[in-house]
């Protein structure tokens, strides 16, 4: 892999991360925020794979597996919270679960 290819992959990874963060901040539905968070986590995962391929070592693949494991745990906890909130509040709007009164 050349330096130009690495740069392209890093730009793509940064774009995925930025799109995910924008989705988390812009959407009000909890389920859409979870999906956007998964997109945001795929950015660093792609960066780990690209950096590992550029340097020719397997540490990038190990970090990718760690990122996938973290993302799977996040989805499991997030979906459980989503179902609990939807049953309790009757809505999937993130503003509905705010405990602040005012």
Swiss-Prot record:
One of its GO terms (cellular component) is NADH dehydrogenase complex. The chain crosses the membrane at residues 6-26, 30-50, 63-83. One of its GO terms (biological process) is ATP synthesis coupled electron transport. Its main location: membrane. It is an enzyme of class 7 (translocase). Belongs to the complex I subunit 4L family. NDH-1 shuttles electrons from NADH, via FMN and iron-sulfur (Fe-S) centers, to quinones in the respiratory chain. The immediate electron acceptor for the enzyme in this species is believed to be ubiquinone. Couples the redox reaction to proton translocation (for every two electrons transferred, four hydrogen ions are translocated across the cytoplasmic membrane), and thus conserves the redox energy in a proton gradient. This is NADH-quinone oxidoreductase subunit K. The gene is nuoK.
